[in-house]
């Protein structure tokens, strides 16, 4: 089931505000989806995700198929029961992960033959197999199996002819995914994925042919795959707003806070990216006033929180709770610097909570600005704040 309601639009851009109703709940859009590849957002308890305002998370079909496997998933009634998350989940098809295997895989019209990265077993992924796996996972949003068109391979930039060949196979796989999804009687929602590389004419053709198939929602794939930033922004400016206005639009694997704000202006409703969690584990912190490198020596004795405007557990602590009852203030940059330098696991846990809170709060502020008819003002203030530096 999927219902999308458009609540507001910005007259000066393609930005829009909506609600997305799925089998496991209602999602306010635009939204960022934290990535939980193996059925967990690294280092974060489901309760913490709830508290920071996560409405929907993403998990990975390929990796969950490898481990723990479908028998285990089926015994829990799907991914929600397995990971104890009662809100919506989106699963990607596994196509990007199979593509990432490089020499370990062989792509044919029927699907992808590859060696398991876990134990070397010979395996096969097809549109039908992907739909069967995602049906067992019982994710609220299912993605078609597609071929991720690379920007370049070993220094060779993908030509238009090569991108067309890849796009056309993804379109055939979209139809096969749709047929199998319906055959299985999956009660959730299947999204088609626009491909076409960095070629706008191919993107246009891909989206038109997918729209003819009448998917409940559409994604823009094949971006953030090694292309220069300006080319990614060109595709963002070209493709999302041309998709049907009455259906949700998802930009896959993007990106920085600036990318999210620009993506909303380009008409995107849904985003996912590993950046806030991966960067947190590697010492890069997102704040209202720019990015902070917690490993830098200048933070060794810094008493400030990561972001004085942030209300996350790392920055604000448990405000309003007495010290005797376990209350405390936020953690200092000095303490988080110390945890990082010592390799203590609490360090990346706290920075991950902060970065995810920052992303989710950014999307909340975007939604509020759209509700108030002030998205343009928000964009200007956001850019000025981020340019200040920390």
Swiss-Prot record:
Annotated spans, RNA binding: 253-259, 277-281
Residues that coordinate or bind substrate: 92-96, 146, 195, 222
Entry keywords, A to Z: Glycosyltransferase, Metal-binding, Queuosine biosynthesis, Transferase, tRNA processing, Zinc
Catalytic site positions: 92, 272
InterPro entries from the UniProt entry: ArchSynthase1/Queuine_TRR, TGT, TGT-like_sf, tRNA_ribo_trans-like
Annotated residues for binding of Zn(2+): 310, 312, 315, 354
UniProt pathway annotation: tRNA modification; tRNA-queuosine biosynthesis
UniProt keyword Chloroplast, yes or no: no
Positions in coiled-coil regions: none
Entry GO CC: cytosol
Enzyme Commission code: 2.4.2.29
Record's catalysed reaction(s): 7-aminomethyl-7-carbaguanine + guanosine(34) in tRNA = 7-aminomethyl-7-carbaguanosine(34) in tRNA + guanine
Superkingdom of origin: Bacteria
GO MF annotation terms: metal ion binding; tRNA-guanosine(34) queuine transglycosylase activity
Keyword Glycosyltransferase: yes
GO BP field: queuosine biosynthetic process; tRNA wobble guanine modification; tRNA-guanine transglycosylation
Note on how the cofactor is bound: Binds 1 zinc ion per subunit.
Cofactor list: Zn(2+)
Summary of subunit composition and partner proteins: Homodimer. Within each dimer, one monomer is responsible for RNA recognition and catalysis, while the other monomer binds to the replacement base PreQ1.
Family classification: Belongs to the queuine tRNA-ribosyltransferase family.
Classification via HAMAP family: Q_tRNA_Tgt (MF_00168)
Role, per record: Catalyzes the base-exchange of a guanine (G) residue with the queuine precursor 7-aminomethyl-7-deazaguanine (PreQ1) at position 34 (anticodon wobble position) in tRNAs with GU(N) anticodons (tRNA-Asp, -Asn, -His and -Tyr). Catalysis occurs through a double-displacement mechanism. The nucleophile active site attacks the C1' of nucleotide 34 to detach the guanine base from the RNA, forming a covalent enzyme-RNA intermediate. The proton acceptor active site deprotonates the incoming PreQ1, allowing a nucleophilic attack on the C1' of the ribose to form the product.
Name assigned to this protein: Queuine tRNA-ribosyltransferase
Naturally occurring in which organism (per UniProt): Paracidovorax citrulli (strain AAC00-1)
């Amino acid at each position: 089931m999927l219902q999308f309601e458009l609540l507001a639009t910005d007259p000066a851009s393609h930005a829009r505000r909506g609600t997305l109703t799925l089998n496991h709940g209602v999602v306010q859009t635009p939204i960022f989806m934290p990535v939980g590849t193996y059925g967990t957002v690294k280092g974060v308890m489901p309760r913490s995700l709830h508290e920071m305002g996560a409405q929907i998370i993403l998990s990975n079909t390929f990796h969950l198929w490898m481990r723990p496997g479908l028998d285990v998933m089926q015994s829990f009634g799907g991914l929600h029961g397995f990971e104890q998350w009662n809100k919506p989940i989106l699963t990607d098809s596994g196509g990007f992960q199979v593509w990432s295997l490089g020499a370990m895989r062989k792509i044919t019209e029927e699907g992808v033959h590859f060696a398991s990265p876990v134990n070397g077993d010979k395996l096969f992924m097809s549109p039908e197999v992907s739909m069967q796996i995602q049906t067992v996972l019982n994710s609220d949003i299912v993605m078609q199996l597609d071929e991720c068109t690379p920007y370049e391979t070993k220094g060779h930039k993908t030509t238009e002819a090569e991108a067309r060949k890849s796009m056309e196979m993804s379109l055939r796989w979209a139809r096969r995914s749709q047929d199998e999804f319906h055959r299985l009687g999956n009660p959730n929602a299947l999204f088609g994925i626009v491909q076409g590389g960095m070629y706008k004419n191919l993107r246009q053709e891909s989206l038109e042919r997918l729209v003819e198939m009448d998917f409940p929602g559409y994604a823009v794939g094949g971006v953030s795959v090694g292309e220069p930033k300006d080319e990614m922004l060109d595709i963002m400016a070209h493709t999302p707003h041309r998709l049907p206005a009455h259906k949700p639009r998802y930009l896959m694997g993007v990106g920085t806070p600036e990318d999210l704000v620009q993506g909303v202006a380009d008409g995107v409703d849904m985003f996912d990216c590993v950046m806030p969690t991966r960067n947190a584990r590697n010492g890069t912190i997102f704040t209202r006033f720019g990015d902070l490198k917690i490993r830098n020596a200048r933070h060794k004795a810094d008493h400030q929180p990561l972001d004085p405007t942030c209300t996350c557990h790392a920055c604000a602590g448990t405000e309003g709770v007495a010290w005797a009852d376990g209350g405390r203030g936020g953690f200092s940059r000095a303490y988080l610097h110390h945890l990082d330098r010592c390799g203590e696991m609490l360090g990346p846990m706290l920075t991950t909570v902060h970065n995810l809170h920052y992303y989710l709060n950014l999307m909340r502020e975007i939604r509020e600005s759209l509700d108030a008819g002030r998205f343009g003002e928000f964009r200007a203030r956001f850019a000025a704040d981020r340019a200040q530096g920390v």
